[in-house]
Amino acid sequence: MPEIIIVKNEAEAGEIYGRCVADLIKAKPDAVLGLATGSSPLAAYQALAKIVKDEAIDVSGVRGFALDEYIGLPLTHPESYHATIHRTVVEPLGLDPAKVHVPGDVLNGTPLEDGDKVALAGPAYDRAIEAAGGIDVQILGIGTDGHVGFNEPGSSLASGTRVKTLAEQTRIDNARFFDNDINQVPTHCITQGIGTIMKARHLVLLAFGAGKAEAIEETVEGGVSAFCPASALQMHPHATIIVDEEAASRLRHKDYYRYAYTHKPAWQGI
């Protein structure tokens, strides 16, 4: 069962994540971070960047692997996840760009039709993560339908990094990054699979707003099912879900989650 932390706002959630990762980097200077895009992690990255600066933490050895990437967008496209990760994580934290990887880096706009090259990129990415020693902390967002990464409902809970077709709802949700024009949103992606994500040593999922309440209810208190990919976190030995009051509004056991978090010993961390 994941630890559930209910916070006032995104800033408080960001502070919790930032402290967790900053302490990790101090203890393990070559830590491997799992990185996600979207709006949910932004406050977390900002909090971490502030701690790194304020405490003069050396991040020169830190490595990173992003969750996913659109297929067909060149790396230079502003909404490619390569560009987004560099804009929101690499530059603010001062990470070495050569040590931060995105699944589509080797594709760089390769069209879906180039099946041989596209199909090989997923297994190669999983091997790269394994060669780095695995991911220490993986940050996650969650879609309104319970997807994590680009693992849409129905994705295998044992899947590795591979090519997926984006659900129409995901394309609608992401159109806000493409001038609200769904026709500009790619139809396919390459994403870490649920099986790949579950190999990370610590998972931290963030969710904010009433629009995520149903997905959080299914993730935390529903059954484990491929139709809510995030529900796989119930099976992870070290998963933390940080939500605001609105995202937690449908949880039946909120009082217990609050009690458990406020009464845990400080040495446990998150």
From Swiss-Prot:
The answer, when asked if Transferase is one of the entry's keywords, is no
GO term, biological process aspect, one: glucosamine catabolic process
Q: Which Pfam families match?
A: Glucosamine_iso
Give the signal peptide as a residue range, or say none if absent: none
* Broad EC category: hydrolase
Q: Carries keyword Hydrolase?
A: yes
The entry lists its GO molecular-function terms as: glucosamine-6-phosphate deaminase activity; identical protein binding
Keywords attached to this entry: Carbohydrate metabolism, Hydrolase
Q: Which PROSITE patterns match?
A: GLC_GALNAC_ISOMERASE
Gene Ontology cellular-component terms for this entry are: cytoplasm
Q: Which CDD domains match?
A: GlcN6P_deaminase
The biological pathway it contributes to is: Amino-sugar metabolism; N-acetylneuraminate degradation; D-fructose 6-phosphate from N-acetylneuraminate: step 5/5
Q: What is its EC number?
A: 3.5.99.6
Catalytic positions? 68 (proton acceptor), 145 (for ring-opening step), 147 (proton acceptor), 152 (for ring-opening step)
Catalyzed chemical reaction(s): alpha-D-glucosamine 6-phosphate + H2O = beta-D-fructose 6-phosphate + NH4(+)
What is stated as this protein's family in its record? Answer: Belongs to the glucosamine/galactosamine-6-phosphate isomerase family. NagB subfamily.
What this protein is reported to do is described as: Catalyzes the reversible isomerization-deamination of glucosamine 6-phosphate (GlcN6P) to form fructose 6-phosphate (Fru6P) and ammonium ion.
PANTHER family the UniProt entry points to? GLUCOSAMINE-6-PHOSPHATE ISOMERASE
Q: What is this protein called?
A: Glucosamine-6-phosphate deaminase
> What is the protein's species of origin?
Bifidobacterium longum (strain NCC 2705)
Its lineage reads:
Bacteria, Bacillati, Actinomycetota, Actinomycetes, Bifidobacteriales
